[in-house]
Amino acid sequence: MAMNFVTFNQDYSYLAVATSKGFRIFTTDPFAKSYETKEGHIAIIEMLFSTSLVALILSPRRLQITNTKRQSTICELTFPTTVLAVKLNRKRLVIVLEDQIYLYDIQTMKLLYTIQTSPNPNAICALSPSSDNCYLAYPLPQKAPPSSFTPPSHAPPGNTHVSPTSGEVLIFDSLKLEAINVIEAHRSPLACITLNSDGTLLATASDKGTIIRVFSVPDGHKLYQFRRGSMPSRIFSMSFNTTSTLLCVSSSTETIHLFKLSQQTSSSRDTSPSSSTPAGRDRAFSQSSLGHSPDRSDVSGEPDSSEFPARKHNGTLMGIIRRTSQNVGSTVAAKVGGYLPKGVSEMWEPARDFAWIKLPKPSQNAGGSGNNGPLRSVVAMSNNTPQVMVITSDGNFYVFSIDLSKGGEGTLTKQYS
């Protein structure tokens, strides 16, 4: 039996595992099996908080919404291409394909909006768990340049977007169904993004994996900048704690890093024209790996203001939103103009982690996901105790205790297989 996918629910009280023979749901504190079915090949599973509603991807293109308590199917949907990710909160259901994002009203399962995106094979996307700040974040789509080649009439329509070459994030209000901001996060393409539980903070990492940045949402002010390390690494998972005072990051180095979100606030305010410090979470599990090459800005910690070509005024960025987001008219552009901060120069050096965790070495015969690549992991922080929960691709669940006052290396307290 192969483990295909693993995720925490929105408040980290449950853990769901999709396998080649059904799926399992566990409580995290205490760790115990809550539900199990041994039927069907499940590619992806997502829970809706602690409810009995579960979203399943059964075949590459088929979504099933299931009530585990009643053991009944609520609805099924089939999509034109492979479903790469599913996100949900109490208001919205988000389906991520390689070049499209579908937004549904989760109460009625009515399709509300379809977003055309750049190719997104790693399903980089985050939905806030909050019903009020119901923001969706995804890589800013980049339009394909005009081509003089005219395809034959019988040829299928090609993709109108190209893969991103920089790490810009588009913030989309999934209640109002409009794009509201673009955040210039990294010079290199994005590898991982996550929103906190309140929908007020966005954490980002590029495909270099050396620098982690945290921005306020929706205004896009950069609040924190952290250095994970000097060598490139694939970021697998990022997670805020409930109070948004800690950010936990896992990567292909098999070291979990914890960063404090309270030390750089004064510095960021000094260097930002009007920074604010709102106060949360998300989760992701990546099934793929990207190549790496050094990124000068991320590796050396050069000032962030040099990462992007200079823009004369906010109108240029509004133009990007107009070109890349559907049905975003002049009224939206006017709103966005009030959100976008002007370029600022950051003078502080990225902060290091205050605590870290070394994952145990996997055993030689660990089956995991059937991949001999790096040990992949998903991280979350307990709501009740200073503990970090880690689930790895070789099928292990770890609980580590952290000293919140002194930091340092975390201590393994529990392990389940």
From Swiss-Prot:
Give the record's GO CC terms: endosome membrane; phagophore assembly site membrane; vacuolar membrane
Annotated S-S bridges = none
- Find motif (L/FRRG motif) and give its ranges: 226-230
Coiled-coil residue spans: none
Sequence segments annotated as region (Disordered): 261-314
Give the UniProt subcellular location, in the record's own words. Preautophagosomal structure membrane; Vacuole membrane; Endosome membrane
User: What are the entry keywords?
Assistant: Autophagy, Endosome, Membrane, Protein transport, Repeat, Transport, Vacuole, WD repeat
What Pfam families does its record include? Answer: PROPPIN (PF21032)
Please name the SUPFAM superfamilies in this protein's record.
WD40 repeat-like
Q: Per the UniProt entry, what are the Gene Ontology biological process annotations, in alphabetical order?
A: autophagy; protein transport
Q: Where are the WD repeats?
A: 1-36, 69-114, 139-182, 185-225, 230-269, 312-358, 370-410
Q: Specify whether NAD is a keyword of the entry.
A: no
What membrane topology term does the record carry? Peripheral membrane protein
Keyword presence, Protein transport: yes
Bias class Low complexity marks the residues at 262-278
- Which function does this protein serve? The PI(3,5)P2 regulatory complex regulates both the synthesis and turnover of phosphatidylinositol 3,5-bisphosphate (PtdIns(3,5)P2). Necessary for proper vacuole morphology. Plays an important role in osmotically-induced vacuole fragmentation. Required for cytoplasm to vacuole transport (Cvt) vesicle formation, pexophagy and starvation-induced autophagy. Involved in correct atg9 trafficking to the pre-autophagosomal structure. Might also be involved in premeiotic DNA replication.
Tell me the domain comment: The N-terminus might form a beta-propeller domain involved in specific binding to phosphatidylinositol 3,5-bisphosphate (PIP2), leading to the association of the protein to the membrane.
Subunit note: Component of the PI(3,5)P2 regulatory complex.
Please state which protein family the record places this protein in.
Answer: Belongs to the WD repeat PROPPIN family.
Q: What is this protein called?
A: Autophagy-related protein 18
Q: Please state the gene responsible for encoding this protein.
A: atg18
